[in-house]
Each structure stands twice: as C-alpha cells, then as structure tokens.
Amino acid sequence: MASATVVSQIQSLYIIKPRLSPPPPPHRQFRSIYFPTTRLLQQHRFRQMKSVVIVPATAAETARKRYPGESKGFVEEMRFVAMKLHTKDQAKEGEKEVTEPEEKAVTKWEPTVDGYLKFLVDSKVVYDTLEKIVQDATHPSYAEFRNTGLERSASLAKDLEWFKEQGYTIPQPSSPGLNYAQYLRDLSQNDPQAFICHFYNIYFAHSAGGRMIGKKIAGELLNNKGLEFYKWDGDLSQLLQNVRDKLNKVAEQWTREEKNHCLEETEKSFKWSGEILRLILS
C-alpha cells in the first residue's frame, strides 16, 4: 500500500420543431363548402410556422459532459482521480498542493527492520479485513472480488513467520492498521461505493509503488531477500486486468452520483494507507 507522498520518494442544444402537415384532404364524394380550400390551408400553415417558439433544451435533453477517463470505463476514472492527488514531482498528472507537514517530501529515507515489521503487521490487519469482507459479501457486489489472485493475507503470514524464524520479535498491530481496518468494516456495511474505492486503491497501489518499496527494502535491509508479499501466482498484469473488468462491471449499476461518491473517497484512502506506510520509518 503506497501513499502518494512516500512512494514518490522512492522514485446542442436540441431544438424540436413541430412537424406541420396539412389536414387530410376531404373525400371526393363529400365535397362541401365547409372544407377549407388549398389557399386557406397554405395560409393556416404559414400562421402556424410563424408561431413556432424555439426554447432552450432542458438539462436532460442536453448531452452530458463526460468525466475524465469515463469513455474507457470507471476504473480509468478512479485512476485519473488518484493520479491528480499526487504532486507534480510525483506524477505528470499531479495537481496536489502540499499543505500539511506530513505531505512534505521525506528528506531522509532511513528504514529499519523494526519499522518494516510494524508496516507488515499493520498491512496484514488491513488485508485480513478486506478479504473477510469480500468473502462474507454483506453487499452482493463484493462477491465479484473473491479469489482474484491479488489477495495478500496468506503471503504476509508466510513473511512474518520467516522473520520470526530469523529471531525477530513480531510486534502487535498498532493504531494505524487497527483503525483503518475498523473504518473499512464500517464502510462495507453501509457504503459499498466508498468501500470499493479503498479496495481498488489498496490492491492496485501495492502492485505498483508497493513493489518498488519492497525491492528497495530487500536491497537495504534483507540482503536482497524477496518476500512473498511482493509475489503473485500467475501473470500480475492479467490479474489486475481481470479485477478492472469486474470493477467496471459493478460500477455500471451505479448512478452518476454513486460513482462520484466513490471517487471522492480516494483522498481518504491515500491518507489511511500513508499512515501505515510511514511505519517503515518509525
């Protein structure tokens, strides 16, 4: 799970005109002075045409402006919003202005094994929670994300066992992981769109920036030992694409307002993940 801050340091109008058609001509067998003449019909049509009022189209009639990435599917919208939350130094699409002290660039990258273990332990708490929520599927859409191949809980358990065998003491989960896990449980009960935002950002960030961090930690602290946390069974790019397809399928059932609500949760996802990531430097 990589935060926007720390990861970077490692690197028309429709006008409806009435159709004016003359009344049907009278049946020849019943010609009468009461039927209008051709001249009268022409005058009637002219008066009708002069009375046509052109009014602006309603909002529903006007073509809706598409959101960035919308034409490619909702996942592309999510990616676009996530990239905007980076600074210009972190990504070319970045628009975020640094306003908080914790958002400032890390001037000293000095990870420790103890700090990294805290990060792994708290990460496992979050992945355990995600996988249980998806497995229980209190909301029907969650079932779509069972057994995606992106699950990390079992891999983290193996890594923590390896550290234990090397003589390290495994710490207890701390507040960043415990609080985030509780937040995810609460969201999953009443706010599926917001929960799925976190699901997407956690798994996809780990597959990108998370791997960069893992490689750097392995080189600096673990004698290039590759952890299971950064390994997947099968082609990772295909696993990610399968989940993208599922996310797009689920989002097709949402209203535009629900989609926007999901996107608005992105910044909170970055905040929670960033707190766990900073444990590496503790």
Curated annotation (Swiss-Prot):
GO terms for biological process: biological process involved in interaction with symbiont; heme catabolic process; heme oxidation; nodulation; photosynthesis; phytochromobilin biosynthetic process; response to absence of light; response to nitrate. Residues 1-56 form a transit peptide. Disruption phenotype: Reduced symbiotic nitrogen fixation (SNF) in root nodules associated with an increased superoxide production, and development of brown, rather than green, nodules during senescence due to the accumulation of hemes and melanin-like pigments instead of biliverdin (BV) in the periphery of the nitrogen-fixing zone. Its main location: plastid. Highly expressed in root nodules and, to a lower extent, in leaves, shoots, roots, flowers and pods (at protein level). Its EC number is 1.14.14.18. It catalyses: heme b + 3 reduced [NADPH--hemoprotein reductase] + 3 O2 = biliverdin IXalpha + CO + Fe(2+) + 3 oxidized [NADPH--hemoprotein reductase] + 3 H2O + H(+). Key enzyme in the synthesis of the chromophore of the phytochrome family of plant photoreceptors. Catalyzes the opening of the heme ring to form the open-chain tetrapyrrole biliverdin IX with the release of iron and carbon monoxide (CO). Produces specifically the biliverdin IX-alpha isomer. Can form complex with heme, is ferredoxin-dependent and its activity is increased in the presence of ascorbate. May affect the plastid-to-nucleus signaling pathway by perturbing tetrapyrrole synthesis. GO terms for cellular component: chloroplast; plastid. Induction: Accumulates in developing root nodules upon inoculation with the symbiotic Mesorhizobium loti strain MAFF303099. It is found in: Plastid, Chloroplast; Plastid. PANTHER family: HEME OXYGENASE 1, CHLOROPLASTIC-RELATED. It is an enzyme of class 1 (oxidoreductase). CDD domains: HemeO. Disulfide bonds: none annotated. GO terms for molecular function: heme oxygenase (decyclizing) activity; metal ion binding. The gene is HO1. Belongs to the heme oxygenase family. This is Heme oxygenase 1, chloroplastic.
